[in-house]
Structure formats: structure tokens, C-alpha cells
Swiss-Prot record:
Superkingdom as given in the UniProt entry: Bacteria
GO molecular function, one term: structural constituent of ribosome
Lineage: Bacteria, Pseudomonadati, Pseudomonadota, Alphaproteobacteria, Hyphomicrobiales
Protein name: Large ribosomal subunit protein uL2
GO BP annotations listed: cytoplasmic translation
Organism: Nitrobacter hamburgensis (strain DSM 10229 / NCIMB 13809 / X14)
Record keywords, A-Z: Ribonucleoprotein, Ribosomal protein, RNA-binding, rRNA-binding
């Protein structure tokens, strides 16, 4: 889908660049596949702020997207493509031959009327799902499982994909968008193709108010606060903080490595950080 620009009738319109969604379904989502969604405002179950600068925003209904695609060898027809406010990608409503409906992540080049199917050995075409070990090397995939049967976790946002670059015994080698290469078990499943809406990265929000509609509040820097509020705060006039960047709680930030999951390090063949050196 193309990008939309607008006549500069206001400063916000002048800057605004949106994805043209005219080809998407304009009605309401399927009620049986949606749930109510309460705004958390960045608070956890105790009412304390756990994520700063969140709150407000437009009311949203959550669409239950099927990331597992567990219905094997039952063809489904794509009924329509829809907008989903909860993610950057578009979603597709599919209807199985037995009448059941489901939402899936829409890949690029998936059109209304197409047939998709999940199974052990299926055609290599967008939207079909099968184990990574049964796909040819070089296949572009999305919505990839990291644990067998858990449901897709990798390459789910707009325009993303992973590529199968090799095999190693029971595992396949995946190259991710970040540049990381990692081992994923061959029985983990993935959907063929790249995720829809690749133009999302070229959009421009245009004005602060549109960000507020998305539920994001103004972000305040530590150096403009008082010493009671932030380690970088205080000082006469403008200061640079006077120390290496830290969070409001004094922990190093901006490049400090925080990964502690050593048990899965053996599955990472090439780190995403190696590419930047």
C-alpha cells in the first residue's frame, strides 16, 4: 500500500505521512474474535507506575490473533484484510472449510480470496504455515516459533521477516532483521512470507497530539529535573548531567548490556551487536 501526504492546511497536516489504508475492510471486527481492553496507564496490579509516560489514548478493542495456527490440513479462505490498532501489521480474517473464523497476521502479497493452509508439507506461498525444517533454505518466513507449539514470537511487526540460511542437525539457522543469526528447532513452525505494511517505517506522526492518541505522554529528560527527581537533575543553568547516563534509579543506561539469559546463548550464532562494530 502507498503512502498518503496531505495539503499543508496546518503544521500538523504539513508533516503528516500516513499509510493509505483504503484497500482495508471499513467495518467493525468480528465480535466473537474481539475482547475489551482496559487502559493500564503504565500501572501494574498494585497501581504503581511501572512504565513512565503512558496514559490516555483512544479506546481500543483487542483482536484475538491466532499465532499458533494449530488447525492442520484444513484450507481457509481469506475473507478480508483489516486494520488492527494493537499492532503495526495488518490482520486477515480467514474462514476454514468447517466454518470456523480466525484472525491471522497478514503477510505481504496476501489478497482477499486466497487460500491458506497449515500442515507438515504445504506449498511455499504467503500465509501458509509449516515446520521450519521442511522449508527450503532461503525461504522468507514470519511469525516464527521459538518453542515447539508455543505460537509465533519472532518477526511479527510490520514489514519484518526472517530468512532460513542453513541447517544444523535438528535445527535451522535463521537470520533475523536485526542481523542476529540463531538456531531454531526444525519442528518449530513459521508462516511463509514477510509481514504486511512495510511502509509503516516511512510514516510521520506529524504532531504531538497524534502521539497522545496512541497513549503516549510527554517524555521528560533527567537533566531538566531537580536533584530530588533524577540523578542528572539540578545545577545552575543548563548542564550536561555530569555523569554517565543513568536511569532515575541510578542504573546505567544508553548501551549498558542487560541480557542475563545465559542458558539460550548457545542458540545465538551471530549476535546482533556484532554487526555494529
Amino acid at each position: 500500500m502507498a503512502l498518503k501526504t496531505f495539503n499543508p492546511t496546518t503544521p500538523g497536516q504539513r508533516q503528516l505521512v500516513m499509510v493509505d489504508r483504503s484497500a482495508l475492510y471499513k467495518g467493525k471486527p468480528v465480535k466473537a474474535l474481539t475482547e475489551g481492553k482496559r487502559g493500564k496507564g503504565g500501572r501494574n496490579n498494585t497501581g504503581r507506575i511501572t512504565v513512565r509516560f503512558r496514559g490516555g489514548g483512544h479506546k481500543q478493542a483487542y483482536r484475538n490473533v491466532d499465532f499458533k495456527r494449530g488447525k492442520e490440513d484444513v484450507p481457509a479462505i481469506v475473507e478480508r484484510l483489516e486494520y488492527d490498532p494493537n499492532r503495526t501489521a495488518f490482520i486477515a480474517l480467514i474462514k476454514y472449510q468447517d466454518g470456523e473464523q480466525a484472525y491471522i497476521l497478514a503477510p505481504q502479497r496476501l489478497a482477499v480470496g486466497d487460500t491458506v493452509v497449515a500442515g507438515n508439507y504445504v506449498d511455499v506461498k504467503p500465509g501458509n504455515v509449516m515446520p521450519l525444517g521442511n522449508m527450503p533454505v532461503g525461504t522468507i518466513v514470519h511469525n516464527v516459533e521459538m518453542k515447539i507449539g508455543k505460537g509465533g514470537q519472532l518477526a511479527r511487526s510490520a514489514g519484518t521477516y526472517a530468512q532460513i540460511v542453513g541447517r544444523d542437525h535438528d535445527y535451522v539457522i535463521l537470520r533475523l532483521n536485526s542481523g542476529e543469526q540463531r538456531l531454531v528447532h526444525g519442528r518449530c513452525r513459521g508462516a511463509i512470507g514477510a509481514v504486511s505494511n512495510p511502509d509503516h517505517m516511512n510514516t510521520s506522526i506529524g504532531k504531538a497530539g497524534r502521539t497522545r492518541w496512541m497513549g503516549r505522554r510527554p517524555h521528560n529528560r533527567g537533566v531538566v529535573m531537580n536533584p530530588i527527581d533524577h540523578p542528572h537533575g539540578g545545577g545552575e543553568g543548563r548542564t550536561s548531567g555530569g555523569r554517565h547516563p543513568v536511569t532515575p534509579w541510578g542504573k546505567p543506561t544508553k548501551g549498558k548490556k542487560t541480557r542475563s539469559n545465559k542458558s539460550t546463548n548457545k542458540f545465538i550464532l551471530i549476535s546482533r551487536h556484532k554487526r555494529k562494530k
